[in-house]
From Swiss-Prot:
The record's free-text note on cofactor binding: Binds 2 manganese ions per subunit.
Binding site for Mn(2+) 1: 41, 108, 119-120
Keywords: Cap snatching, Endonuclease, Eukaryotic host gene expression shutoff by virus, Eukaryotic host transcription shutoff by virus, Host cytoplasm, Host gene expression shutoff by virus, Host nucleus, Host-virus interaction, Hydrolase, Inhibition of host RNA polymerase II by virus, Manganese, Metal-binding, Nuclease, Phosphoprotein
Underlying gene: PA
Sequence similarity: Belongs to the influenza viruses PA family.
Reported function: Plays an essential role in viral RNA transcription and replication by forming the heterotrimeric polymerase complex together with PB1 and PB2 subunits. The complex transcribes viral mRNAs by using a unique mechanism called cap-snatching. It consists in the hijacking and cleavage of host capped pre-mRNAs. These short capped RNAs are then used as primers for viral mRNAs. The PB2 subunit is responsible for the binding of the 5' cap of cellular pre-mRNAs which are subsequently cleaved after 10-13 nucleotides by the PA subunit that carries the endonuclease activity.
Cellular component annotations (GO), alphabetically ordered: host cell cytoplasm; host cell nucleus
Protein's name in the database: Polymerase acidic protein
InterPro entries for this protein: INFV_PA, PA/PA-X, PA/PA-X_sf
Intracellular or extracellular location(s): Host cytoplasm; Host nucleus
Gene Ontology annotations of biological process type: cap snatching; DNA-templated transcription; symbiont-mediated suppression of host gene expression; symbiont-mediated suppression of host mRNA transcription via inhibition of RNA polymerase II activity; viral RNA genome replication; viral translational frameshifting
């Protein structure tokens, strides 16, 4: 950090900062973040003053430095950066000549035009928090406060920003540049977190020792110590604090706080249109597995060997044909692609030794399906600056889609138990430290509830597919590699099992940036007839490829076997998150843990054992049109896990927006249920922000429908 400061700031500023730290007995080799903060503050004070003069008529003017008029009177007197004695001498002199009231603390500047002292603040936290700390410390009407943040926000007394917009923009740009430079060197996080609040020196009852440490530990985020939190709370007017805050932000804002009553909220409007379609990267409830138990074949664990072994377990293959075409695709190409996979797998089996990986021949059907040579040619921007009508592609607005019942069915299925164990105990991670016995017990109970869950199967399937695809994308960039979609599990009896869901063929994958896309064709086995819900399969071409004999209570029966084929794409960053889907287990475990903690604090003893072993007790799971659904603690665990998994599988900007905006409405409704008499302003704007996210995503539409059920029952 010290090297960065010396490179980034003017030597004069660095020298002044060194003097200031020496004056306060601080070591800049140790307090490097403070060194950077002092330099930043000095530079902002100097930039605030630069180019601002007062002419003979007493008007404020902005003049560049090399202008001959620079002999005009400077508008600002700089106090910051002087040693304490000299600074107080300047302040006293100003007070004597202008009649200004002497401030309690040394300000940063004096404004000769407005006749007031100015306190400049530069914060890495929220501007309003820092503003209130400053105001509480100064406790003076006569010192004007102006706060800047590294994110481009600012706040000033009575929203009077003193300088013209261009001068302030210069300061904000410089702060943003400093932040970027720090981030590039990996220094920003440490710098951001090191900011302490304003220290106020007042005589008050002292809290010391253990109580003091406990007080400091139990503060809300963004507060470094009890004093800062006190200052923040003291700065709030009990009445009208929202209006006050808004008026500080802008003179134009005039918000009327409306009471939020049971009759106030309306349901969220879901879009009309054709039903939404399946958009996950792989099939969920409709997937079919070809499996081998206790695999012990040669090359066991090598995906291609495992896949061929699984394919050999099925004998009902037949000449494939299309049963549900893709509306916009060249469907024969999908059919030819599957035939090519079968033929090339047959070729491998005829070889003496099976290779570890298989690169497909670059046939016309695969080139079409993988979008080979379809991307528009990239041209350097500098080469087309002179083109007068240069513009971005016209892109159509996405078509609005309505909620369809299949997504609720998918979710219900994800919460169900399967007859296999998908995670071992150590999937959540061993205890790193000698952690309490309680934590291990909770983890073991939770794992027992979710290890058989279908959502856990989706996690392991997602981790495998994304890992295999990312590896292939890096190792075989130019090849059309065949990637089997595999998962591993154990039967109830503990026997190992390898499952094949189908295949992926990846396209060219020169992935330089995190968001660069690799195309792939997925081919997945299923027993679901696509003609039952054709809208769900809009993006797929579905083939019938065989007949499967199934054992049932009434004997054997034959069912047609389908292959769901589609072109898809993903990116490095999406695959990276897909590989980390196990985090969903951790997230849902933490949610369960907070429920146990709440119960334990009421009973004043650890309730983990009772929580999981009392099978008669039911817990709220979620809302449905019928009301609050309840179930066993195991069902709660599996539902929370399924929600977390679906958030990962259906991650999208629509989901991000809906979650963030609907949460605001949820908090207001919760406040109403807790009889806190909440008030709102611009509720219509909040609804608009929520409904803007409801376009065509099935998971977002389902969440919006659940939210409406919650509103109905919460406000009865």
């Amino acid at each position: 950090m010290e090297d960065f400061v010396r490179q980034c700031f003017n030597p004069m500023i660095v020298e002044l900062a060194e003097k200031a730290m020496k004056e306060y007995g601080e070591d800049l080799k140790i307090e490097t973040n403070k060194f950077a903060a002092i330099c930043t503050h000095l530079e902002v004070c100097f930039m605030y003053s630069d180019f601002h003069f007062i002419n003979e008529q007493g008007e404020s003017i902005v003049v560049e430095l090399d202008d001959p008029n620079a002999l005009l009177k400077h508008r600002f007197e700089i106090i910051e950066g002087r040693d304490r004695t000299m600074a107080w001498t300047v302040v006293n002199s100003i007070c004597n000549t202008t009649g200004a009231e002497k401030p309690k603390f040394l300000p940063d500047l004096y404004d000769y035009k407005e006749n007031r002292f100015i306190e400049i603040g530069v914060t890495r936290r929220e501007v309003h928090i820092y503003y209130l700390e400053k105001a509480n410390k100064i406790k003076s009407e006569n010192t004007h406060i102006h706060i800047f943040s590294f994110t481009g926000e600012e706040m000033a007394t009575k929203a009077d920003y003193t300088l013209d917009e261009e001068s302030r923009a210069r300061i904000k740009t410089r702060l943003f540049t400093i932040r970027q430079e720090m981030a590039n060197r990996g220094l920003w996080d440490s710098f951001r977190q090191s900011e302490r609040g304003e220290e106020t020196i007042e005589e008050r009852f002292e809290i010391t020792g253990t109580m003091r440490r406990l007080a400091d530990q139990s503060l809300p985020p963004n507060f470094s110590c009890l004093e800062n939190f006190r200052a923040y709370v003291d700065g709030f007017e009990p009445n009208g604090c929202i209006e006050g805050k808004l008026s500080q932000m802008s003179k134009e804002v005039n918000a009327r706080i409306e009471p939020f009553l049971k009759t106030t909220p309306r349901p969220i409007r879901l879009p009309d249109g054709p039903p939404c379609f399946q958009r996950s990267k792989f099939l969920l409830m409709d997937a079919l597995k070809l499996s081998i138990e206790d695999p012990s074949h040669e090359g066991e664990g090598i995906p291609l060997y495992d896949a061929i072994k699984c394919m050999r377990t099925f004998f009902g293959w037949k000449e494939p044909y299309i049963v549900k075409p893709h509306e916009k695709g060249i469907n024969p190409n999908y059919l030819l692609s599957w035939k090519q996979v079968l033929a090339e797998l047959q070729d491998i089996e005829n070889e003496e030794k099976i290779p570890r990986t298989k690169n497909m021949k670059k046939t016309s059907q695969l080139k079409w399906a993988l979008g080979e040579n379809m991307a528009p040619e990239k041209v350097d921007f500098d080469n087309c600056r002179d083109i007068s009508d240069l513009k971005q592609y016209d892109s159509d607005e996405p078509e609005l889609r309505s909620l369809s019942s299949w997504i609720q069915n998918e979710f219900n299925k994800a919460c169900e138990l399967t007859d296999s164990i998908w995670i071992e105990l150590d999937e959540i991670g061993e205890d790193v430290a000698p952690i309490e016995y309680i934590a291990s017990m909770r983890r073991n109970y939770f794992t027992a509830e979710v290890s058989h869950c279908r959502a856990t199967e989706y996690i392991m399937k997602g981790v495998y597919i994304n890992t295999a695809l990312l590896n292939a994308s890096c190792a075989a960039m130019d090849d059309f590699q065949l990637i089997p979609m595999i998962s591993k599990c154990r039967t109830k009896e503990g026997r190992r099992k390898t499952n094949l869901y189908g295949f992926i063929i990846k396209g060219r994958s020169h992935l330089r940036n995190d968001t660069d896309v690799v195309n792939f064709v997925s081919m997945e086995f299923s027993l679901t007839d696509p003609r039952l819900e054709p809208h769900k399969w809009e993006k797929y071409c579905v083939l019938e490829i065989g007949d499967m004999l199934l054992r049932s209570a009434i004997g054997q029966m034959s069912r047609p076997m389908f292959l769901y084929v589609r072109t898809n794409g993903t990116s490095k960053i999406k695959m990276k998150w897909g590989m980390e889907m196990r985090r969903c287990l951790l997230q849902s475990l933490q949610q369960i843990e907070s429920m146990i903690e709440a119960e334990s604090s009421v009973k004043e003893k650890d309730m983990t054992k009772e929580f999981f072993e009392n099978k008669s007790e039911t817990w709220p799971i979620g809302e449905s049109p019928k009301g609050v659904e309840e179930g066993s603690i195991g069902k709660v665990c599996r539902t929370l896990l399924a929600k977390s998994v679906f958030n990962s599988l259906y991650a999208s900007p629509q989901l991000e927006g809906f979650s963030a905006e609907s949460r605001k409405l949820l908090l207001v409704v919760q406040a109403l249920r807790d009889n806190l008499e909440p008030g709102t302003f611009d509720l219509g704007g909040l609804y608009e922000a929520i409904e803007e996210c409801l376009i065509n995503d099935p998971w977002v539409l389902l969440n919006a429908s659940w939210f409406n059920s919650f509103l109905t029952h919460a406000l009865r």
